[in-house]
Amino acid sequence: MASTSRGEEKKKIKLKITKNKMITVFVIIAAVAVAYIYALYVPKPVYSVDYRGIILNFRVDLREANKIPVEPGPDQVYTELINPLVKNITIVYKPTGDPDEDKYYSLAAFEIAEKLKLGMLARTIYDVGIDAKPLSEFNRTDYVNLPGKIQHPLIAVIHPIYANQTRVFAAPGHVIYIEATSYEGFDLAIAKFLISALKIKF
């Protein structure tokens, strides 16, 4: 009788161990499957792209930047700048009077000019100059009625101090506005402008 009950206890213990092992194996397989599906289907951040053989590196995730609205649409930004009539592009800004805040303009102007130049080189466009000037160079104190031309479009970069929305706006009169109400939005809007201007795919 005692040996029979011991045998039954051993079977129960083995059965419990086997069930626990099966549950553990099942949990591990399920976790691996979930991780694989996540890695396969959840988009990863994009910080660099191969643009016609030239690597363009960005400071922000292009997937996030792509959510910034472009008015009336990305094609208007592209056709304004990638145009055989364009000879010069000027980045226009309104100084804040604070050197720390104005650093954002320097960073924005550098990123825009560098990426546009590289993008144009990739498209074999060699004769377009890009520079940056304060509004005072155009006898203006604000961004209204900027004198853009088809041969000389303007990119008006609006600091978060002055902006009341976050967007890229291709306005009539050959002026493209980049504006944002936050510093993060400012960086994203600049990236969205470049995505639109160069038709970057990722």
Indicate residue ranges for each PLM-predicted region.
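Long, folded non-catalytic interaction modules
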Residues: 54-202
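Secretory targeting signatures
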Residues: 1-50
